[in-house]
Amino acid sequence: NTTVDILAIGAHPDDAEIGCAGLLIKAKARGLRTGILVLTQGEMGTFGDPETRRAEAEAAARILQVDAFRILDLPDARLEFNYENTLRIVEVLREWRPRLLLSPHEDDHHPDHVATARLVERAAFLATRPALFPQYEPLIPQPRHLTFPLSFQRPLRPHFVLDITDVYGIKQQALQAHGSQYGPILFAVEIVARYYGMMIPAAYGEGFLTKSPHPLTDALGII
């Protein structure tokens, strides 16, 4: 059975690559198991059909060397925060059993990103309920949840920034795998990565936010 330590959940086939590819790469290098769950096939995007976008997402997942990858069939541009969609995520959480969840932040211009943040937060709680999907053990403890900004127009001030300078080249390769989507937007991704990097300081960074405190097991993690 496939299990992961860290699961990135995006509304569209390239969300995880934009927001947290660096974290996934660095986690994999430390021996952690990683996964990507995509909620829609991106069929309403300006460029690319669902088959193309699936192939591109699979290629990017191979570059990131994730241990688990899946694309659901929820409707692109009509992704709703409701119980039925939440249960689709809950089933994957119970199956893959992540300890840390990554998703877009809810303060975003795209309604699908807003819905994804709320769906993941609710699914993390419901995954602990024994009555749901009894074929799997309840996911206890509830996985922690970090969010990443996806809006180029208004990048948020993160609670912490991960230095991804040493793996930024691999992140770029994963983004370039989405050939139907990228070109000029790669420049925007780099600008945001440099913006977050300047905060720490580093050449490139990824920013993350949290609604609840995250425990430190080593005080050296903050210096």
Residue ranges of model-derived segments:
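Metal-dependent de-N-acetylase/amidase catalytic core
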Residues: 1-9, 80-223
